[in-house]
Regions:
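Phosphate-binding glycine-rich loops and adjacent basic patches that engage nucleotide phosphates
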Residues: 1, 38-44, 56-59, 87-96, ...
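Terminal amphipathic alpha-helical/low-complexity segments used for targeting or macromolecular assembly
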Residues: 1-53, 58, 189, 195, ...
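A generic structural signal for ordered alpha-helices
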Residues: 2-9, 52, 56, 74, ...
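Generic, low-specificity signal for short hydrophobic/alpha-helical stretches with a mild N-terminal bias
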Residues: 9-13, 42, 60, 78, ...
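Glycine-rich hexapeptide-repeat left-handed beta-helix
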Residues: 14-16, 22, 109, 116-220
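A generic local structural motif
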Residues: 47-49, 66, 84, 161, ...
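Short secondary-structure boundary segments
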Residues: 64-96, 148-154, 158, 209-220
Length: 220
């Protein structure tokens, strides 16, 4: 699979960050500095700096029981629900939902993505209109703490990253209580059944019933 064809980078305020990358994961170490640079250049009539290095767009709803640590950008019409924990270095797109007891750190969430219930998203990128079911975990650290290697068919890609979660393609849905292993890449328009252990590279337009039972999705 072409792992660089699963995201529409026009569907995020961070588009510029992706332009010079060979692989999407290369943006992960750059998120913190990029947020500060971008935040200070935003239209102050539209984006408000509500705390140090935390910028919020128009019509954003932030529950008083949520926690937001900068640097962080939350784009227009997004809802941050009670108990959400944005742990720093996070870009949230337009019209997103970040829900109860969801923790996100060092990640980019594209427009219209939904992470609504009891999720962990670490060092990850979630594409346009992607959705995580309740309890989905995007794990970002191997048990042996070694650097993450992406295996794409016969190709091995050295990330030189100790922490990397998942890259989830546009319009992809991951079912409840699934666990996605570090360094996983999931193509666009793919559906993953609940309670699935996801690892490696999964193509676009697939239905993942289990890692041993992946079928093509009918395109309507």
């Amino acid at each position: 699979m072409d792992i660089n064809s699963i995201l529409d980078i026009d569907k995020t305020i961070s588009r510029e960050l992706f332009l010079d990358c060979t692989y999407y994961f290369e943006v992960l170490p750059k998120i913190k500095n990029y947020i500060v640079k971008l935040g200070n250049s935003l239209d102050k009539n539209k984006y408000k700096e509500i705390d140090t290095n935390i910028w919020v767009g128009e019509n954003v709803i932030i529950d008083k029981l949520s926690t937001i640590i900068g640097p962080c950008i939350i784009d227009d019409n997004t809802e941050i629900r009670p108990g959400a924990y944005l742990r720093g270095n996070v870009i949230i797109g337009k019209n997103c939902v970040i829900g109860n007891s969801t923790e996100i750190k060092n990640s980019i969430i594209f427009d219209y993505a939904q992470i609504p219930h009891y999720n962990y998203v670490g060092d990850s990128i979630l594409g346009y209109h992607s959705h995580l079911g309740a309890g989905v975990i995007l794990s970002n650290l191997k048990n042996d703490k070694s650097d993450i290697v992406i295996k794409n068919g016969n190709e091995k890609i050295e990330t030189n990253l100790r922490k990397m979660g998942a890259i989830v393609g546009d319009n992809t849905d991951i079912g409840c209580n699934s666990v996605v292993f570090p360094g996983s890449i999931i193509g666009k328009n793919t559906s993953i059944y609940p309670l699935t252990r996801v690892r490696g590279v999964i193509g676009s337009n697939k239905i993942v019933k289990s890692m041993d039972n992946i079928v093509n999705k009918e395109i309507k």
